[in-house]
Amino acid sequence: MLKQVFETTDLKNSFQVEIGTYARNVDPSVLIRFQDTVVLTTTVFSNKKNNFDFLPLTVIYQEKFYAAGKIPGSFLRREGRSTDHEILSSRLIDRSLRPLFPKEFRQEIQVINTVLSSNPDFKSEIASILGSSLSLLISEIPFFEPVAGVYVAYIQNQFVINPNAQQLTNSPLHLLVAGTKKNVVMIEAHASEVSEEMFLEAIVFAHEYIKKLCLFQEDVQKKVGQTKKLIDLDAELQSLEKEFNEQYHEQTRTLVANVFEQDQKNDLQVFKKKILAKAQQKAFVKTIDQITFFDVEEQKNYLLLIENLFQKLFNQEMRNYIIKNKKRPDKRTLEEVRNLDSQIDLLPRPHGSALFTRGQTQSLAVVTLGTLSESKIIDDLSGESNKRFMLHYNFPPFAVGSIGRYAAPSRREIGHGNLAEKAILPLLPEENDFPYAIRVVSEILESNGSSSQATVCATSMSLMAAGVPLKRAVSGIAMGLFMDSKTNEYVILSDIQGLEDHIGDMDLKIAGSDKGITALQMDLKIEGISQAILKQAFFQAKKGRLHILEHMNKTIASPRKEMSQYAPKVQMFQIKPEKIRDVIGSAGKIINQIIENHDGVKIDIEQDGRIFVMHSNLETVKQAILFIKNLIQDAEVNSIYHAHISRFLNDKAGNILGAFAQVSPSIEGLIRFSKAKKENDVVKIGDKVLVKCVKINERGRIDFVLISKK
């Protein structure tokens, strides 16, 4: 493909798209330029047919340190495994694209977004969504609807598209929206207790900009787009599916009705076994005209296919029943939340713990408090920073009664932990008010849907139990949607369980306090939803959230005044930055003495003069702070001090003119003798004395008079 360049013209901040220059073994690759940010997107797909019952799409987002003119800080000085930020960004892009592929398409696709140049004032994920969509759109892959994403902030009473870093710092709203010309397909947001109304306004505002980016992509497609590949449907499989549905449709519909009306869930397994047994009898016949025999592997694949056909038919009948009858499999009403149970203080040694159970979903949240020096160090394209609040989400296989591998956290675990972390963060106290690093681990002990929102609830209660002065309690809820694509009839479900999530069309997670929303995430399995549906889901979620908060407040309504006896005690105080060297001393001599003399107390000193002192005993902390304050205090005229003689002042002839008395490393003054002496009979070096400050000149030099010698 020849090099071609396109540029958005009707947008305030223009994107430039270059096609046909880079990565020419890929067809196509797209280079996006926006405000010094450059992202290369490549798309490759396999012609091999797969028997997957899902779309094997892999999206990778990677940042190169050279993009910001930096050398990696790792030992090897090169990029390593994906960071949490890269994983979360990959998930964002994936969630924006996946709903728009035809359900029948099953060929493997890999989309890679590489950040080659980075402007810290612009979110590279926005360029990556645009590049990924455009790359797929102009390829022969059956991807027909362009998608685009924008970031929205709220600055000085107005919404701002793709704000810079400074604007984001001052915004109560951080919203990323992806959508097509017609609908929104993905939302990711965190906020400082923002109302549902503001969120909805921001989404509408974002969608107007998204439409323009989608139209731009369509214009590019008309000029350079390839002919789309036809989806090669297996005629034999289609025939088998049609025959299967005709044979079992009515029985499956009756079975679904029995599950809903009479709670006959055992009938499902009996019916399924009956179908598989019948299929097994036919498994040796491969053709009609000539009898041949399946080998063992073919028999296995055939039975798996029949099982998948049954599950597909059953799921569709379940969906139809829920939409038509407005009923749920577990007999709840559409807005009803599952049974709730919560406890705190389950574990004696950790600094705080809480167990939150909602139906068959259960999260155990455990809090650990530490010094700020134990904060997580993040080194990325925007520079090095510290993260004092960490929430880690673990989903072991036993949570769903399975056997599985224990390995590094999965993308899903990282994503769920990040969502819960963002939900809690706005309610945490400021660093100066609560100078601790905080780590929360959520162990999912049972799971039947909405475990990330159970994590939010358990974390909120565990922090209060640990004595962390959380401003308000935070709860979360997951909302679902079932929509008939032919009639547009739909139902919205509150607090979805696993089955409803699996066969439904939407997973909308909303967390917040009684004052507003703090985190939001929406994923779809359909090509988008209207503003009306979104509005209904938001306010239905609010009702459920407040119900859950009411329950949580019965367990613990406010943070404890006292922390656990096993939690470290940290206090912070401020000194002048120029006094830091007096606390540290030459080669760390003084600070090491302070630590040694105060039972190994931990001391962290920041460049701005803040000092954090930590120990398990509060009295030890106070003694260390008092010692440091005395150490760096400034001298005052007429004040009396305990000191020691540190050295003498001599003239050129060697006569002793006076002696220097040191009170602390920052206070040293001169005791002047009435007349010069060859030999001093008043004091000796090392003598302990009591002195009075009588003068401090304009250069800060101190004069003492000797009161007495000890």
Swiss-Prot record:
MF terms in GO: 3'-5'-RNA exonuclease activity; magnesium ion binding; polyribonucleotide nucleotidyltransferase activity; RNA binding
S1 motif domain segment(s): 638-710
**EC class (word):** transferase
Instruction: Classify the main location.
Output: cytoplasm
GO CC terms, sorted: cytosol
What does this protein need as cofactor?
A: Mg(2+)
Alphabetically sorted, this entry's keywords are: Cytoplasm, Magnesium, Metal-binding, Nucleotidyltransferase, RNA-binding, Transferase
Q: What is its EC number?
A: 2.7.7.8
Q: Name one GO biological process term.
A: mRNA catabolic process
Pfam families from the entry?
KH_1, RNase_PH, RNase_PH_C
What's this protein's family per the entry? Belongs to the polyribonucleotide nucleotidyltransferase family.
Fetch the NCBIfam families from UniProt: polynuc_phos, PRK11824.1
Q: What is this protein called?
A: Polyribonucleotide nucleotidyltransferase
Organism name: Phytoplasma australiense
Gene name of the encoded protein? pnp
